[in-house]
Amino acid sequence: MAITIVSVRARQIFDSRGNPTVEADVKLSDGYLARAAVPRGASTGIYEALELRDGGSDYLGKGVSKAVENVNIIIGPALVGKDPTDQVGIDNFMVQQLDGTVNEWGWCKQKLGANAILAVSLAVCKAGAHVKGIPLYKHVANLAGNKNLVLPVPAFNVINGGSHAGNKLAMQEFMILPVGASSFKEAMKMGAEVYHHLKSVIKKKYGQDATNVGDEGGFAPNIQENKEGLELLKTAIAKAGYTGKVVIGMDVAASEFYGSDKTYDLNFKEENNNGSQKISGDVLKDLYKSFVTEYPIVSIEDPFDQDDWEHYAKLTSEIGVKVQIVGDDLLVTNPKRVEKAIKEKACNALLLKVNQIGSVTESIEAVKMSKRAGWGVMASHRSGETEDTFIADLSVGLATGQIKTGAPCRSERLAKYNQLLRIEEELGAEAVYAGANFRTPVEPY
């Protein structure tokens, strides 16, 4: 007898920021229960699929009871009797038939909510792996038609600024990538050691308070100069003895400080802001180029506003060979926006966030499209996370080559890194760590 879905239930749980989010349980006819929870971002791109929130005064408007109800009343009953291994069929059914809402960038999930659809999509994927009797990462690889499993290079967000932190720093994330490690296990060692050295460097320079951690486990010292963040990383990497082996990545999240006057305000968090730090896209572009010359930077994410295609393309053509230019708010994991960016040569790497697009199938499509264009792919958490580890398996199964899921601190971040350690151990001699090939770990599939 074929194993089928017998029930789908959702509930409201809490993310790592104490805000409500959606968790779904998919129960199968053999008694197996697959469970998945969705994350939520702080700096969200305006083109992301619609996340349904209740509004009103409960939970300060952030409740998800409507999304939960949509799973329990609309999606759940409609999936009973379906084959959990048919990921594409189930995702398309939810997105195109049960929801059916469309905007200029495709299926926008406005009726049921991307958070409702995704929770079920992730749980169905876990259920499908169970039915096939294979680990989740292998099931994901099979769904994508990928033959090569690869452990990603972790990009640890160790200094927080932007919308993630209460300091004056405009740029949102300063990351370390252990590209010189020979395994994921060694990469974790390097990352953790640099993190602890960074903590003592910051404590010595700015005092104990500066070592409090932000939403993603990174430190948020009260510095204003973005260059100072890079300097701290360089020092910590050297103190740990990993110069040349651990390199730097940045997530600028520039949409957060882009004004209607088309300037970028590096002073946007200052209360008495007199506009003295407002700069043009060209000046900002040259600032990045100076950073790249002075520091071992291999990756810059969201360097410009999500609609500033012109400066994205300029930066990519000028430094794209040496540095990956990652589209997050620009692309929002949306296949149509990825297509546009490929055509306009706007960037050369995709940030993969399943909750930006709202289904496993569409996420896989965005990744395949990116890889065929010769781009890099970085799987990513959100700042409001849960203990769910789906993205760890997703990253290995799709051979993204890179993953960012916070600092080596805070359990909702370590949950993903620890899962990757388990996967590497399980693969044994077959385990491949992306290392220096993090931008193109496998041939396109």
Swiss-Prot record:
Q: What is its EC number?
A: 4.2.1.11
Q: Which InterPro entries match?
A: Enolase, Enolase-like_C_sf, Enolase-like_N, Enolase_C, Enolase_CS, Enolase_N
> Can you tell me which residues bind substrate?
164, 173, 301, 328, 380-383, 404
Q: Give me the comment on cofactor binding.
A: Mg(2+) is required for catalysis and for stabilizing the dimer.
Offer a single GO CC term for the protein.
phosphopyruvate hydratase complex
Q: Give the top-level enzyme category.
A: lyase
Recorded hits in Gene3D superfamilies, A to Z, give: Enolase-like C-terminal domain, Enolase-like, N-terminal domain
Q: Where is the active site?
A: 216, 353
Residues annotated as binding Mg(2+): 251, 301, 328
Which metal ions or organic cofactors does this protein require, according to UniProt? Mg(2+)
This protein's major location comes to cytoplasm
Which Pfam families does the record cross-reference, listed alphabetically? Enolase_C (PF00113), Enolase_N (PF03952)
The cellular location(s) given in this protein's UniProt record come to: Cytoplasm
One BP term from GO: glycolytic process
Query: What are the alphabetically sorted keywords of the record?
Result: Allergen, Cytoplasm, Glycolysis, Lyase, Magnesium, Metal-binding
* Subunit architecture: Homodimer.
Q: What is stated as this protein's family in its record?
A: Belongs to the enolase family.
**Any idea what this protein is called?**
Enolase 2
Q: Which species does this protein come from?
A: Hevea brasiliensis
